[in-house]
Amino acid sequence: TYTELETLNSMVPIWKRPKNEVKDEDYNEFYKNKFMDYTDPLRVITSRTEGTATYTALLFIPGSTPYDYYTKEYEKGLALYASGVMIMEKCADLLPDYFSFVKGVVDSEDLSLNISRETLQKDNQLKLMRNSLEKKIKNELHAMLVNDREKYETFWKNFGRQIKFGIYGDYGMHKDLLGDLLMFYSAKEKKLVTLDEYVEKMPEDQKCIYFAAGDDTDRLGKLPNAQLVLSKGYDLLLCTEDVDEFCLQMMRDYKEKEFKNINSGDLGLETEDEKKAAEAAETENKDLFEEIKKDLNGKVKEVKVNPTLQEHPVTLSAEGGISMEMEKVLRRMPNAEGVESTKVLELNPNHTVFAALKAAHAAGDTDKVAKYAELLYDQALLIAGLPIEDPVAYAQLVCGLMQ
């Protein structure tokens, strides 16, 4: 009799067996065989619910990114069973796009065996199951973040981009659901931090969540405005994926703290004395700024002073809805002609280069002012990680000014 019971039990699908009777190795082997993966899953999620949506689910967070995950060829979906009989190998309607990496099996006794794909899409039971699974997956991911940080950071490296796309792609509709799962690199702590961790450590006088977007954390940390933010004792999120800034712009704020791109608009971090000095310098050098703007021939909307640049002579900022990093991302897309940020050239009134500009202008040397303007603009582009329009002309300009 004992042997017969063993045999019968082994015929029960793994997702229907009590969790305390299944070893971790059994779950891992099932996952690898069923979903043709060579790595163990990062997390196994089991769920049995009764009531409005009655089902049993066995889900897995993969330990590595499928080779085709970020391509059009990737098919999301969970294997859907009705009373132990598979009715669909990949039911996409059970998963929202932002959780499309989840693999697994869902078995329900409430579904008909001969239900068609078209009927299934309209099935209210399926919608209830999807909503329930969405909450379960979110809670399990957050539990992994809290209780197993190392595993969560592996998950984030593999699939964090998809979570960010989920916020951006749905126009921020799911920011409350997904916001506390987000991680970004901290300039202060030199590691990934959550938005909750960032907000908890904000000094009382800090009003915004500051971020910089670009290709490389080292370069971003050296930006003039990054140095300014850090010098005030504030942390800075360094965003290096193309979706990052779009995601944060769509969220707008987190825990009532607005997201602020350090290279878009006025940061408002100058002291009262610096403000007064800047206003005086703006008035005093109005003609010089007009001349520089004219020399740059439409490349910048405005030229102004920025007294907070410390040792940097120049920087670029952007006005309006498109930042300089967004311009870079959008220009890589098809049909992106004419996509451009509205740039502002900001000069450090306390730098020796500014003194040289003023001297050339006072002496009426318009040729030198034009060369300095072009040089400073190109330098500001390089600092911002943007390509200069004519590298040959830039090299000749530098050599000419050195002679």
Regions found by a protein language model. Name each.
Residues 1-403:
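Conserved GHKL (Bergerat-fold) ATPase module
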